[in-house]
């Protein structure tokens, strides 16, 4: 693998790795997912370590959410208990990092409308992590902290209102909280 590859889903190594994982999982291509993804997995892990260790400017777009999604996919697909525990701890560390380092714009409405609103995408990923059973108590506390901030901002654009309502219903359904 060459150096200086992007770690984003839409135009980077993480998207390629998720695509390869999909092809292997559904038998479009033959092979062992751990063997095929070994180099990419190592590269993403090193990139994640660099991202987590370095302080960046507040306006810098980091691939932490994309890396988190990649490791959730790997966690679901892996069978070895040691790797599963490793990915579980890494997932927990990544979502805590994202939550702790969120910016002021995390709760602000996006103009123009965007499907990739970080706060909503993060909530959907938290629900996904909650469903697979990683750090459910911590995620419950995060959701309780986010709830008042999220519902105190009333989106002006109808599409943003609909997106907020949809994400809130999804969260409420999967964590069994009727207040959402």
Regions found by a protein language model. Give the residues of each.
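Glycan-recognition and catalytic cores of secretory/periplasmic carbohydrate-active enzymes
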Residues: 1-180
């Amino acid at each position: 693998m060459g150096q200086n590859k992007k770690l984003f889903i839409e135009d980077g190594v993480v998207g390629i790795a998720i695509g390869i994982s999909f092809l292997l999982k559904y038998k479009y291509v033959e092979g062992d997912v751990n063997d095929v993804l070994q180099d990419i997995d190592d590269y993403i892990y090193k990139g994640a370590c660099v991202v987590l260790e370095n302080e960046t400017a507040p306006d810098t777009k980091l691939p932490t959410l994309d890396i988190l999604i990649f490791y959730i996919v790997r966690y679901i697909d892996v069978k070895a208990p040691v790797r599963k525990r490793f990915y579980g701890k890494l997932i927990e560390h990544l979502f805590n990092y994202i939550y702790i380092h969120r910016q002021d714009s995390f709760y602000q409405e996006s103009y123009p409308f965007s499907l990739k609103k970080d706060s909503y995408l993060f909530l959907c990923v938290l629900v996904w992590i909650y469903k697979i059973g990683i750090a459910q108590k911590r995620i419950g506390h995060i959701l309780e902290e986010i709830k008042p901030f999220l519902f105190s901002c009333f989106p002006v654009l109808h599409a943003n209102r609909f997106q907020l309502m949809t994400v809130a219903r999804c969260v409420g359904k999967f964590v069994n909280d009727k207040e959402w």
